[in-house]
Amino acid sequence: MKHILIVVDIQKDFVDGALGTAEAVAIVDNAAKKIREFDGDIFVTYDTHFENYMESAEGSKLPVPHCIKGTDGWTLNETVAQALADKKYTAVEKITFGSVELPKLIKEAVGDEDFDITLIGLCTDICVVSNALILKANFPEKEVYVDAACCAGVTVETHNAALATMKMCQINIEGE
């Protein structure tokens, strides 16, 4: 069986930059450990915006420029980048919360093999839940896991609400 790890948006702007939180900083070491110990295929998503972010639909609802491609805030958190340094992984740039490209890339990677998927990253209540639900919709017979110890939300309350939502959608929550 193949194992797939999705590292969702552990970028500088979400850890300790424009939209960073103490909770995000607190999960970095757990995420790096998970990456270092993982044996399988790794996909790393990058929230990717451009100079016109404030003119976008997202920018009108979240008026905080972040993850602008080419800026320091768009890059991976240094600890996570170091954990990935010796790993082969597929980078996936996405312009919105969930990646519609990710299921296609996973299908290509697994071929006919059985597989499961684990997600870690930021923010639990926006991009992690969006990608988890997209993956569960595309692979309804596969086990999808989220390691809560490697995730943080915008707030503790919304992190917990996202975990509850994912549980209701038959996504397995570990590390609570």
Region locations from a protein language model:
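Active-site-proximal beta-strand/loop segments in catalytic clefts of secreted hydrolases
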Residues: 45-48, 95, 122, 149
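A short glycine-rich beta-strand->turn/loop micro-motif centered on a GG-aromatic cluster
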Residues: 118-125, 142-156, 176
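Short amphipathic alpha-helical segments
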Residues: 126-130, 134, 146, 161
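Histidine-anchored nucleotide/phosphate-binding helix
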Residues: 30-37, 129-139
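Short phosphate-binding/catalytic loops that engage adenosine nucleotides
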Residues: 140-142, 171
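Short, well-ordered secondary-structure micro-motifs
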Residues: 54-56, 102-104, 130-131, 157-158
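Internal catalytic-core helix/loop-beta-alpha segment
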Residues: 70-126
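Active-site acidic carboxylates
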Residues: 1-90, 112, 145, 154, ...
